[in-house]
Design a protein with these regions (language model features):
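Conserved N-terminal phosphate-binding loop of PLP-dependent enzymes in the Aspartate aminotransferase
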Residues: 1-242
Length: 242
């Protein structure tokens, strides 16, 4: 998104699921490929697993490592521990944050393969890294995510929310997509997703926007069925006012 500018130097961006770009984007000057497993700020755009695997293969053939940006998608958000597991491209580096400590500030990087050993014990990475409170919360989150029924519940809740919104056939909503509890609903041209977001907040439902005109729904992973239905009712009634 433009509001992230200026972008980090040294990166060349390619559109997700662009097969032609794979053929021309990698050479012996390429250090790494980073894949955002579901484009969050870009509009909750899904990545084709076959494309991700092909892009990773092309990058490795050029001598590069493959990295996964799991800051938004990691630790259960999409219904898997890591969304890259679902895409099947097996990254050497994974960055994560947000949900790992259940809302407390925490983040980290995982390394393996060619990237293993880049950081060693004692290397400075973060002033407040490893603080006891966030780590204790992280352990609780990880224990919950180890339960298969929890992650399966995330998938079921997400499918329920998406199907309900689609079934309304509201004139103000275009495509509805997502994975797990990372959901995007495109707002049709002529109506601003930001205006919908503001009205929803007035009515008691916290959402956000992404991409060009997408309403983004990312509820807590432990949201109850009654809370889902309450939120959906607010969303339905609000959309009908436009």
């Amino acid at each position: 998104p433009p509001y992230f500018a200026p972008y980090v130097q040294g990166f060349k961006t390619i559109k997700p699921n662009d097969w032609e770009a794979i053929k021309t984007s990698f050479d012996d000057t390429t250090a790494a490929l980073m894949i955002e497993c579901v484009q969050g700020e870009g509009g909750v755009n899904l990545i084709d697993p076959k494309w991700a695997q092909a892009a990773a293969q092309a990058a490795r053939k050029a001598g590069a490592i493959v990295m996964a940006d799991e800051v938004q998608t990691g630790f259960g958000r999409t219904g898997s521990l890591l969304a890259s597991d679902e895409l099947g491209f097996e990254p050497e580096v994974v960055s994560f944050a947000k949900g790992v400590a259940g809302g407390l500030p925490m983040g980290g990087i995982l390394f393996r393969g060619k990237a293993n050993g880049v950081f060693k014990a004692g290397d400075h990475q973060s002033t407040f890294a490893g603080n006891p409170l966030a780590c204790a919360a992280g352990l609780v989150v990880l224990n919950e995510l180890q339960k298969p029924e929890f992650l399966e519940g995330v998938k079921e809740k997400g499918e329920y929310i998406r199907s309900q919104i689609k079934n309304w056939k509201n004139k103000n909503v275009g495509e509805v997509r997502g994975k797990g509890l990372m959901i995007g609903a495109d707002i049709v041209e002529g109506l601003s997703a930001v205006e919908v977001e503001k009205k929803l907040l007035e009515n008691g439902l916290l959402t956000s926007t992404a991409g060009k005109n997408t309403l983004r729904l990312v509820p807590p992973l432990n949201i109850s069925q009654s809370e889902i239905d309450e939120g959906l009712e607010i969303l339905r009634k609000t959309l009908e006012t436009f």
